[in-house]
Amino acid sequence: MTCTIDKILQDAKTLLERLKDHDNAAESLIDQSSVLHKRVKAMKEVGTAMPEKYQEELAEIKDASKLRPHVLLCQENTQIRDLQLENKELWLSLEEHQYALELIMSKYRKQMLQLIANKIPAPTEPVLEAHKTFSSDLECQIDRICVIGDAMRKAIQLDEDQAYNIQERLAQLELENKELREILSVRNESLRSSKKESEWNFSEK
């Protein structure tokens, strides 16, 4: 039982570390979107006389913005499902340990009642000593399981909060990327119109 409880504690720690990594990845995604937005805003301020290299960067950003949000969204959803499944498995394992402990306590109480009812002639002190030792061990196990239960409840709550925040951030990122693509489309259309107008003016000359 001790080895299994230690494993549950270790799994809970691993889960918390994964949630932290998950949050860091979301923060990185937000930073990337912010940089992308600033670059597009800077390009917009340049005007119709945008250098050729900025036009190439616009095309690259447009292509990247089409692929990155969808791929990252799929990855985040997969990670959330995995974490939720892992939480469920750990919680079921904890419930099994609690049930096993309750079963042990039930058998112990039954044996003690039988011992008292039968009045087996045995030295009093050894019986009391064994009773104290066994009770102490059970109390330690109960305390550890309570600690594990609290840790698991906190981990599950943290997982649910993180999942909600990540979904909200991803939705915001998708909206921002959609707006960026619209801006890029307008800028490209403006560049094409300006180019055609310049060619037309040149041909008239």
From Swiss-Prot:
GO molecular function: protein-macromolecule adaptor activity
Quaternary structure and interacting proteins, as annotated: Interacts with IKBKE and TBK1 via its coiled coil region. Interaction with TBK1 is disrupted upon viral infection or TLR3 stimulation. Interacts with CDC42BPB. Associates with the STRIPAK core complex composed of PP2A catalytic and scaffolding subunits, the striatins (PP2A regulatory subunits), the striatin-associated proteins MOB4, STRIP1 and STRIP2, PDCD10 and members of the STE20 kinases, such as STK24 and STK26.
Subcellular location: Cytoplasm
Chain coiled-coil ranges: 4-32, 154-192
Main location: cytoplasm
Role: Suppressor of IKK-epsilon. Associates with the striatin-interacting phosphatase and kinase (STRIPAK) core complex, forming the extended (SIKE1:SLMAP)STRIPAK complex. The (SIKE1:SLMAP)STRIPAK complex dephosphorylates STK3 leading to the inhibition of Hippo signaling and the control of cell growth.
Source organism of the structure: Xenopus laevis (African clawed frog)
Family statement drawn from the similarity comment of this UniProt entry: Belongs to the SIKE family.
Cellular component aspect of the GO annotation: cytoplasm; FAR/SIN/STRIPAK complex
Cited Pfam families: SIKE (PF05769)
Bilayer-spanning residue ranges: none
GO BP: any one term: negative regulation of hippo signaling
InterPro entries with a match to the protein in the record: SIKE (IPR008555)
Keyword check for Ribonucleoprotein: no
Keywords: Coiled coil, Cytoplasm
Name of protein: Suppressor of IKBKE 1
